[in-house]
């Protein structure tokens, strides 16, 4: 499970790497992005602008927003089957920019050792995400997201049994396009 990540590049690097406009008044480097925080995403609806959504998907049909704190990740293998994720997977996809993520390896029955995982060159990358919009009883809108996870690659399999879906640059464009996400 991906439960923490970092996103700390300077604005110029973000704008060049993701071809987006960054609101300088909103962006702050984050070294410990955590569930329920408002974090940067790039959506299929507005792919040229960085938005800030709450981490923890609140489905549009939820009666209470607290469900979101339990839905920070979505398994890529079963995403089409889960009612909370099915519509966002088909229509509301996003990139979750990062420059590292954290996984904890169990060492014995009580201890966990944290690992920060980055690309070899430490450059920013995008994790696949889905988003949704929820309205509270007063009509206020809240935007939230979840990160897709998959089985770990060979490098991570000794640390954890899941990892975020990390997209190549070509996959990023396809992920936030209007094409079928399964392609």
Placement of each model-derived feature along the sequence:
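Short linear sequence motif anchored by a di-proline
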Residues: 1-183
